[in-house]
Amino acid sequence: MTISKKSMKWIPWILILPVILIRGFTTLYPILVTLKNSLFDIKVLSGVNEFVGLANYVNVFKDDKVQTSISFTVIFVVVSMVFHVILGVALALILNMKFKGRRFLRTIVLIPWAMPAVVIGMAAKWGFNNDYGLVNDFIRRFVEDFQYNWLINTGSARAAVIAMDLWKDLPFFAILVLSGLQFISGDIYEAAKVDGANGVQSFFRITLPLIMKNVVTLCIPFTLWRLTTFDLVYAMTSGGPGEDTSLIAYRITTEAFTNLNVGYAATLAVMAQAQLRAALNNAHRPNTGVDALFHVGDGISHLHHISN
């Protein structure tokens, strides 16, 4: 039996149909249900399920807890990513140097990244304890009567969460930057050295411009991962003190599974998803997002050339 050319055109679609159906069921269907739920007041415990239209969206802007979560999420993402870039590039440069034990160091440096965030959060909760934590125990070796509750005070609790997030994911960021450094030919540095360039000049004129695309591209997924951080906060501070370390992902989970306020949680999820989508679209927009930032390295190199 022969198959006509017209029938052959449908074979690829038939083959990918199961994937499309599975993808639609696991992605599209939950999104549509979440959109629908965001228009309802759904409280599981009281059995309430009433259509309220956009009331949930209006209430978001009046909710002090949500505003606190949004403000800390912004602080968390910005501060964490700034240090990811600065310290990540610095660590990558160190790992790119030639020294004995380099391969071993490149391996063990990934141990924090390989550990579950919940384990890190629980260890940090113990480590920052005032009475028996490692942090205060170390400080008391120099200041005998030192007493400080790191996770009870807002500023230090937020700083501790950011520090542990860096401790976990910074090595992975550095290894990915290192992969970009590996593609830079050593002949370029040799030529620069012959021309009289020192280490600082080589970094700004050669290294930084050549790894800029790699670094900026890495910032996209790492920023998205910061925006969806939940497990670290859950294990380390449970959003405390008060709501001061409650990231938006933690707030959504709390509303859905602790308060059982499904409609309000769906509203927060829709708004968070919209912000993520807008950020992604802006990041890939020509001349405004990542494409524009790709020229930053060239600009830095040019400015450094002028200054010298």
Language-model region placement:
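A structural signal for multi-pass alpha-helical bundles of membrane permease subunits
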Residues: 3-282, 308
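Short linear motifs in low-complexity or flexible loops
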Residues: 283-288, 292, 301, 307
